[in-house]
């Protein structure tokens, strides 16, 4: 059965295989991602993320990373990227 779970965003998160990252967002000052998962899936993988602030340089692109979302945190904006496995 498919279900959407919320995970607190970190540099690395353990997710069920074949899961789909739907959205990133802020709740009460904490960064989260919402992920569509098969709750019967037992195999997992490590999903890795990069969190880049507006105006900060980085050296990756769409070939190695997938853009997820931008999060607004008061005067800061954070851009969330998933590292492709």
Task: Locate each region found by the language model.
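Catalytic phosphate/metal-binding cores of nucleic-acid and nucleotide-processing enzymes, i.e., regions
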Residues: 1-85
């Amino acid at each position: 059965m498919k279900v959407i779970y919320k995970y607190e965003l970190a540099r690395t998160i353990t997710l069920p295989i074949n899961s789909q990252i739907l959205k990133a967002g802020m709740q009460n000052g904490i960064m989260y991602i919402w992920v569509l998962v098969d709750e019967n899936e037992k195999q997992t993988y490590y999903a890795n993320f990069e969190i880049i602030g507006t105006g900060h340089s980085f050296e990756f692109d769409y070939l190695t990373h997938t853009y997820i979302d931008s999060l607004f945190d008061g005067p800061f904006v954070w851009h969330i990227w998933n590292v492709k496995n």
